[in-house]
Amino acid sequence: MNPIEIKDLYSFTFYGGLKTKGRNVVFVKAQANEANNNYEYDLMLCKDGKISQLTDRKNVSSYTFEDKKTLWFTLPLKDDEKKTAFWRLPLKGGEAIQAEVINQPGVQILDFINPDLMLLSIEHTPEDKHPHAEDYEVLAESPYYMNGQGFIAGKRTHYYLYDRKTKTLSDPITNGLKPDVFIVKDGKIYFAANEDKGARQSFFSMSLYEYDPIAKTRTHLINTHMDLFNLDADENRLLFFASDGRQIGLNSNPKLYAYSLADKKIDLIADWHECLGNTVGTDCALLGGNATCMDKNRLCFTSTVVDHNNLFDVDGDALHQILEWPGTIHSFGFAKGVLYFIGAKPGELQELYKMENGEVSQISDFHPELKDKYIAQAKPIFYTGSQDSSQLGWVLYPKDFDPDKKYPAILDIHGGPKTVYGTIFYHEMQLWASYGYFVFFCNPFGSDGQGNDYADLRGKYGTDDYEDLMKFTDTVLAQVPQIDSERVGVTGGSYGGFMTNWIITHTDRFKAAASQRSISNWLSFWGTSDIGPEFVVDQQACGLENPEKLWWHSPMRTISTAKTPTLFIHSDEDYRCPIEQGYQMLNGLIQNGVETKMVLFHKETHELSRSGKPVHRERRLEEITNWMDTHLKGTKHEA
């Protein structure tokens, strides 16, 4: 068997954005292009079990169905990327035809109200007419930047209607609001939104609105006093999962509600205590998906349970589990009553599956390149966590494993913290297993998939979660004697980066560390992160009025105790965990005489490891692997 390599990234294909109409199942395919250092996006069709590629445009950005026979998608206009071209594609065959041009960049098609009226999403940036405007930013509202968007002063995204007959674009129908989820029902548009007050506001203040495109009227239906996760509809109700944050703050699992269009009131359908959607981490799921979908009048949804996804339905007011899946369900829909989904099994990348009459079958074979590769299967290890409960972790064994030899190992810590690790294919982990490492990972206290109580890490960062990770490490070393306890490294990103920082400032049991897009100082994080004020108050159970507590939970407080050689990976446009967090740790280790370095990626965001430029993702893996090789194997690499 051949090893997994870093450059395998360029052979992987990624899938998502699945939508259905009639018997047609359409989804997006993406693949990294090494020469252009970007990703190429095109549309795929599955009909009657046969898969074909619909487009060869390389940059399809959004699409929707006009009807069962016709698809629309958007592209930047070829000769003027400040405009968006709409293309109309017959699904029975034939060439796509450029049908409309909108004098705005990045326009997204959301849906058709009727054959002549389209619902669009457009972002507007106010024009700065001052000379050399590109040389500065004017910040007068908060948040002033957002990860993945850059500086957002004055930028607003609104819904518009485009009339194909008159070739006219309406005024924004969401003016004065910050729209979120939406649904088109019976010729009307229903959406959830917060008021646009030009400043931060509570997550738990969304209202429901109705827009009538015939009367051109917008009606405020009700203030939910909640944060909505989706918006679907049956015959006479709007259905949505929502949280009021009263359980465990921002990370509270949502409950299922219905808004009666007749009675104008909200009813609780299910006091759901689990999470909504797929929160299993991977670096091989580039495209987005959906957590809910209607099958006629039946609402279906996915949920993460410990380390995998299950599918449920709501028939009337009753919940039923309709599929227990061993891996992940990234995107799904129904075509003529048959479930189709893009998912991944343990140790595998994404494929297209269908479930008919209770039987699941795989339709696609997207990844023949992995058939001759060594894929380490995740072996379960149970340990007793900080909550005195039995918890599940996993170990990947190195390629060509010899039980009579000793091997280095890497503890990998997920982000979130309210996400999970599962057993699906994870490129970085499989790479290290192919390169001769044990890789071990778990879901410490604060992770998703085990209810609100287990996820409630508020005010406890670096305590029970740290204890879990140390107990898990102890258990792994006891049960896998082939791991050399003197050659164990640790890495993680985001929350995993915070934990890596916490670990190196509280123990020297790890001989190398790679801290990625991390948090090191909750006091400065409050003022520099795009989500700082609300996230700090929520996750630390206090704000700046209690600086002593924020400082106690900051790895910088104990930086003088750190001895572990540590690599820092950060991006200069990461506004979620800003680069100053890494700078503080870097300076602290340098002052202490600890071996360290930072690799800073320009024009990358918090998403570097998942959707960063392909060449940058390659360099990131090289840097971490070389750092571990140097300190755990004694292998020298060129700088």
Descriptions of predicted regions:
Residues 41, 123-160, 205-207, 254-257, ...:
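Predominantly five- to eight-bladed beta-propeller fold
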Residues 47-49, 90-94, 163-167, 212-216, ...:
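Short loop/turn segments that connect beta-strands within beta-propeller blades
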Residues 11-24, 57-75, 99-119, 147-149, ...:
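Conserved beta-propeller blade repeats
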Residues 82-156:
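Asp-box/WD-like beta-propeller blade repeats and closely related beta-sheet repeat scaffolds
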Residues 366-486, 493, 527:
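Cap/lid segment of the alpha/beta-hydrolase catalytic domain
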Residues 1-13, 48-49, 169-171:
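A short helix->beta-strand "capping" segment at the edge of beta-propeller domains
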Residues 35-40, 78-83, 150-156, 199-206, ...:
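Short, solvent-exposed loop/turn segments at conserved positions within beta-propeller repeat blades
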Residues 444-639:
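Active-site-proximal cap/loop segments of hydrolase catalytic domains
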